Amino acid sequence: VNTLTHHVNTLAEHILAQDSDRYLVGIAGAPGSGKSTLATELSRRLNAQGRKTAIVPMDGFHLDNAILDARGLRPRKGAPETFDAPGFLRMIHALKSGDEVFAPTFDRTRDIAIAGAVAVPAAARVVIVEGNYLMFDEAPWSALAKLWDVSVRVDVPMPELRARLIQRWLSLNHSSAVATRRAEGNDIPNAQRVIDRALQCDFDLNGQPARNS
């Protein structure tokens, strides 16, 4: 069984044992750790088992580039202060209430957030939220910790994160030099900050692929 399948098995077993009308799963971790992949596979498994599940990415709460430019924050895009944290907190409270919620998402290719792109119906019994700062020991993000019914961290060693973050820029057709500069100038410091200020999670998972076994 590969690492991802093992993690999905573990989490799905735990979640399916809960009898709740609305169960919030917070998947935290550094950029490039594999949060989105885990969220997608876990959602697929839960839906296949008859537990209606939705995914909400924290990335939809990126502040627009025009606002970041006005505040001199564009070079730090992805750092905690470049997100609408109060808006994100309000949405998490709305999700906990069990109501239908429309959430934004982020288009990485166009580098823009898209409002109302994710519909979370009232019938969704599980909502998987994934993002860098879901279990993060800096205000106002630290207020999120008590809102998750279960918290999950995806842990990846820094050398692997570095390679993935450079590859992310390469996949957007940047040169090797630009990709490396962007990753090392911003993404990697953000990743280190996530690691340094991490709060204890209910599940701590190794996000490295299994070395062939």
Q: What is each stretch, according to the model?
A:
Residues K35:
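Conserved lysine of the Walker
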Residues L38:
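Hydrophobic positions on the alpha1 helix immediately C-terminal to the Walker A/P-loop
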Residues I114-G116, W141-S142, Q167-S213:
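Small-molecule kinase domains that catalyze NTP-dependent phosphoryl transfer to phosphate-bearing small molecules
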Residues E41:
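Active-site signature of alpha/beta-hydrolase-fold catalytic machinery across serine-
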Residues R110-R168:
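ATP-dependent NMP and nucleoside kinases share a basic, alpha-helical "lid"
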Residues A54, L63-R110:
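Conserved nucleotide-sensing/catalytic segment adjacent to the nucleotide-binding pocket
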Residues R44-A54:
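Post-Walker A helix-loop "phosphate-sensing" segment adjacent to the P-loop in P-loop NTPases
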Residues V1-G26, A30:
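Extreme N-terminal, non-catalytic leader segments
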